[in-house]
A protein has these predicted regions:
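Alpha-helical scaffold domains
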Residues: 1-152
Length: 152
């Protein structure tokens, strides 16, 4: 990928319909290449909205991946990480508390204390301001009364 919108459109209109979409989330998120890594989180956000058959347990294991992804200082990746976190939080009442807790932790602390491995990737990753920005933005959206009222 070379453009964020092409990356997102492929996730929204193609990749999410494949049988291997969930596996690709981790594979793409582990990449050091900016748009490939973005695709991992954009695909996760798309699945959180579009895969109505998936359970909360299908998404909960991705929260640590989001936490690691939030440490990446690249803006286009941060926006996709934020998107994934917010969509998982809005998916169900079962996921909402976990997503909101992660958002609050990111906003307060700026991430997971530099934990590595497991798909965090390198390529400009650093703890701190990016994670705090992602956390603050997600908390702001996830605590809106109109958003909370829509969560089922």
């Amino acid at each position: 990928f070379r453009l964020w919108d092409l990356c997102d459109q492929c996730c929204i209109n193609l990749f999410r319909y494949t049988s291997y979409a969930y596996g690709k989330v981790r594979e793409y998120a582990a990449s050091d290449e900016e748009f490939t890594r973005r695709a991992g989180f954009a695909l996760l956000a798309t699945l959180a909205v579009g895969d109505k058959r998936a359970s909360d347990d299908d998404f909960r294991p991705f929260l640590p991946l989001i936490e690691r992804g939030a440490e990446d200082s690249r803006v286009r990746i941060g926006k996709a990480v934020n998107w994934a976190l917010r969509q998982i939080g809005k998916r169900s009442r079962g996921l909402y508390p976990d997503a909101l807790a992660l958002a609050r932790r990111l906003a307060a602390e700026g991430g997971g204390g530099g934990r590595g491995g497991g798909g965090g990737g390198g390529g400009g990753a650093k703890e701190g301001p990016a994670a705090r920005r992602i956390g603050r933005d997600a908390v702001r959206e996830l605590t809106l009364e109109r958003i909370i009222a829509r969560i089922k």
